[in-house]
Amino acid sequence: MRVSKYLLSTQKETPANAEVVSHQLMLRAGMIRRNASGLYSWLPTGLRVLRKIEAIVREEMNKAGSVEILMPMVQPADLWVETGRFEKFGPELLRFQDRHNRDFVLGPTHEEVITDIVRKEVNSYKQLPLNLYQIQTKFRDEVRPRFGVMRSREFLMKDAYSFHIDQETMDETYEAMFQAYSNILTRLGLAFRPVMADTGSIGGSMSHEFHVLANSGEDLIAYSTESDYAANIEKCEAPLPTETRQAATSEMTLVDTPNAKTIAELVEQHGIAIEKTVKTLIVKGATEEAPLVAIVIRGDHELNEVKAEKLDAVLAPFEFADEAAIRDAIGAGTGSIGPVGLNMPVFVDHSVSIMSDFGAGANQDGKHYFGINWERDLPEAPAFDLRNIIEGEPSPCGKGTIALLRGIEVGHIFQLGTNYSEAMNANVLDQNGKSQTLLMGCYGVGVSRMVAAAIEQNNDDRGIIWPEAIAPFTVGILPMNMHKSHRVKDIAEQLYQDLNDAGIEVMFDDRKERPGVMFADMELIGIPHVVVIGDRNIDNGMFEYKNRRTGEKQDIPLDQIVEFLKAQQA
C-alpha cells in the first residue's frame, strides 16, 4: 500500500479526553474516530488489525467444529420477554418501536435469537450436539462509555452457542471452546490467563474468563502462588475467619465525629484501629417490604458487589441506594451510617461477625458509636462472604497464598444449563422418544476489544508495537528523499514490487515528507519491520533494517533483503 493512496490520519498530540494508552494510540495512529459517545468509525489502519483478529478467531472456531451463521442485530422484544430479560437486563438494553408500534431491541447478546432458531430447526437428538457461531456487531447502552473501544456502546463480538442432550457432550464442547480461546490468544501473540468467573446476567453454572494481562486492566485476577488456581476477584472466595470473637471490654459510647465522613478520616482523627471499624453500605432491596438493605464489611475490606447481589434480599442488578433514600429511611447521611438500630435487613461479612468493641456510624450526622458488641448492643446478623479477597490471604484451593494481577477480559465462556432452553421451550426427542430440554453453552470473544487489549500490552513512548500476526502491515519502506534521487526511487519501487510478489504486506511511504515525520509515523503505527533506503546505503550495497520491537538495526545486502524479511516472519 502506497501512503500517497492511503488514508493515513496520524496525530502528534495526545488527545486530552483519552484516558488509557490504547485509546490515545488508536486515535493518534488514525485507527478510529469518535462519532458519538461510545461509537467509533474504524479507519483503514484500525480495520486491517480488526480483520486480522477476526480471521484468526474464525479459523480457530471452524477448527473447533463450530459452524458460522449470522443473526440480526435488531431483535424482536418478544423473545426477551420470554426469558424475562427484557426487564432484568436494565437500561443497557436499547429498546425501540418500529412504525407499526412493535417492540424491538438492539442486541447486546443473542441467546434468545439462537434459542428461537434451534427450537424451530432441531427436533431430534440425532442433530446434536450442535455448535453455532457468528461475528456480529453488538450494542449495549453503557451509562459511561470510556477507554475508546475497550468499553464502547457498539462493538464487534464473536459469540458461539452450543446445544446438547447430555452433560458429557456439553463438557466436551466446553473444553473444545476453552482450547480454541487459548489458541486464539496464543496466535495473537498476547500474554493471557484463563480464570474462573461469575456467570453474571447471562446465568449458568460454570464459567471462565480469558484475560489479556495488562497493568491498565479493569479486572483483578486472584491466583495461587503454588497451584494453577486463578479466578476473577469477583468469584474468589475470601477465607473464613480462624479466630473466635473476643469478649467485650468496653461500653458502647456515642462520640462526636463531625469531620469524619470516611473510615480513613475516622481512623486518623480518633485513633481507632481500622480493623476495629466497619462500613455500613445501604443498597436497594429486592422486595417492596424491604426496599433498602444494609451490608456491613470491615473498614479495611472492599465490598464484592457480585457476591452481595447473590443475596436474595438484594436487588439484581446490584445498585447502591441514593443519598435521598438513605436520609429518608435513616435520618443521616452515608458518612454516619451504622448497623445499630437499623430498621432494615442487615447482612454482614464473616469477618464482621467475629468483631468486638468496634466502631460504626451512629445513624446521626457527625456521630459514631465506639465499643459496639454483638448481642449486647445489636442482634446477631446473618453472615456471608461479601468482600474481596486480599493479597497474601490463603488461596481457596488450599495451596499457597493469593497474589493479584490486572487483566483485560477479552473472552468469556459459560455452561448455561437449561436457563434459556427451559424458558423458551427448546426441547428435542431423545433416543427413547421422550422430550428433553436442551443444555446450552455460550462462548463470547470481544473482537474489537482485543485490538485495544493488544495495544495495552504492546506499546512504548513512541507508539504501538504490534504482535506480528495482527500488525496492519508487516514491512514499512522508508525511502529517504526519493523525490530527489532516481536511484532511491527506483530501488524503493522495485523492493515494493518484490515484497508484494512475495505475499508480504507493505506500507510504502512515498510522500514528500521529512524523514523524521516518516519515521515517527511508522513507529506510531507499529509496523514490525522497517527498511530504510538512502543514497549512502545504496553506495554500500545495503538496506538499513530496523526491528520495531527490539529497536535493533542491521545492514542487509540489497539482494538478500526479501529473504531476510521472509525469515523474520517465520
UniProtKB/Swiss-Prot annotation:
Q: Which reaction does it catalyse?
A: tRNA(Pro) + L-proline + ATP = L-prolyl-tRNA(Pro) + AMP + diphosphate
Q: Which SUPFAM superfamilies match?
A: Class II aaRS ABD-related (SSF52954), Class II aaRS and biotin synthetases (SSF55681), YbaK/ProRS associated domain (SSF55826)
Q: Name one GO biological process term.
A: prolyl-tRNA aminoacylation
Q: Does the keyword Nucleotide-binding apply?
A: yes
The listed locations are: Cytoplasm
Q: Which GO terms describe its cellular component?
A: cytosol
Q: Which Pfam families match?
A: HGTP_anticodon (PF03129), tRNA-synt_2b (PF00587), tRNA_edit (PF04073)
Kindly report the protein's main subcellular placement as a broad class.
cytoplasm
Per the UniProt entry, the Enzyme Commission number(s) are 6.1.1.15
Q: Name one GO molecular function term.
A: proline-tRNA ligase activity
**Nucleotide-binding among keywords:** yes
Q: Record's CDD domains?
A: ProRS-INS, ProRS_anticodon_short, ProRS_core_prok
Gene3D superfamilies per the UniProt record, alphabetical: Anticodon-binding domain, Bira Bifunctional Protein, Domain 2
| Keyword annotations | Aminoacyl-tRNA synthetase, ATP-binding, Cytoplasm, Ligase, Nucleotide-binding, Protein biosynthesis
PANTHER family given in the database record = MITOCHONDRIAL RIBOSOME PROTEIN L39/PROLYL-TRNA LIGASE FAMILY MEMBER (PTHR42753), PROLINE--TRNA LIGASE (PTHR42753:SF2)
Written domain comment of the UniProt record: Consists of three domains: the N-terminal catalytic domain, the editing domain and the C-terminal anticodon-binding domain.
Share what the entry says about its subunit structure, partners included.
Homodimer.
Q: What does this protein do?
A: Catalyzes the attachment of proline to tRNA(Pro) in a two-step reaction: proline is first activated by ATP to form Pro-AMP and then transferred to the acceptor end of tRNA(Pro). As ProRS can inadvertently accommodate and process non-cognate amino acids such as alanine and cysteine, to avoid such errors it has two additional distinct editing activities against alanine. One activity is designated as 'pretransfer' editing and involves the tRNA(Pro)-independent hydrolysis of activated Ala-AMP.
Question: Would you identify the family this protein belongs to, as annotated?
Answer: Belongs to the class-II aminoacyl-tRNA synthetase family. ProS type 1 subfamily.
Under which name does UniProt file this protein?
Proline--tRNA ligase
Record gene name = proS
